[in-house]
Amino acid sequence: MQNINIGKSGIQVPFLGMGTWAIGGGSWWGDNDDSLSVKAIQTAVEQGIQWIDTAPIYGLYHSETVVGEAMKHIDRDKVVLSTKCGLEWRHETPVLHKVVDGTTVYRDLSAKSIIEDVEDSLRRLHTDHLDVLYTHWQTPDFGIYPLEETVEAMMKLKEQGKIRAIGASNVTADIIRGYCKYGQLDVIQEKYSLLTRRVEKQLLPTCKELGVSVQAYSPLEQGLLTGQVTMDTTYPEGSTRNSNPSFQPARRAQALDMLAKWGDLTEKYDCSLAQLVIALTARMIPGLHVLCGARTPQQVMDNAGALNIKLDGADAVRMKWDVDAIS
């Protein structure tokens, strides 16, 4: 299993990581069996999924708490652990983010808030260091929280050994350059799938130039690319899928027609459509890290199957042609 770099940090991991947003539960994901979630994280590490990603906002600390419980039973050296900072509900700030389960959440990328976030996360995660620290959402007005202050705080945490690599999520090319100007940026985490490819044109050229890695979240496009969604599948009122452009009738039909063309490949590689999509997604961008969510051991096993797929060059070209045809 080939490892790939996380920017210039010196950290290397397999391409597939485990996302733990769903483990946070709450109104977005519904109730969780935390004991199953702990087993899911243990299973991930056993299957060679080393990168475990979480965030304080996931379930308003609940995801971090569950990941921390799992870490009590896992060799820390076998895990690349990432979390995030910059979303605040301990106190009000000038930048409103949104309301989550009745709690008003703000953005705060001040040095003070970042340091507090990290200390709190270290405690919940039962560790003395984070392998990657992401800023979760950037502030629209850097006059309130200067980017230089944000990056300097993260560089200080790195010098102290509390974090090993610096990441940023939900960025622009200019913001990537800003991080690199004031310090170091190792990785960005962005939405990317076979249907959502803005990263390739808007961010990838800058990342290549500056040696910044990319980690993709939502690679299965909220389940649309698993092969389990049909044109007749409906979602309850309030579901984000109802507003996702990929789920609208015309785009959904394109996606399902594309997946239908790959039935012979699932037989050839003895895999599910979801596993095939994950494997292809990892090849779309050289060195791409792919983050797949799971909250049960079975879901982890399903995702982990993608690690064993070695696509033939001709098959990868054929599939990419199909993807390009609907892009």
Residue ranges and their predicted role:
Residues D31-A44, S110-R124, T172-G178:
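Short, acidic/polar
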Residues N3, Q138-S327:
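Beta/alpha (TIM)-barrel catalytic core signal, keyed to glycine-rich beta->alpha loops juxtaposed to Asp/Glu
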Residues S9-W28, S82-T104, Y134:
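N-terminal small/glycine-rich loop or linker at the start of catalytic domains
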Residues M1-V80:
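N-terminal binding-site loop/beta-alpha segment at the start of enzyme catalytic domains
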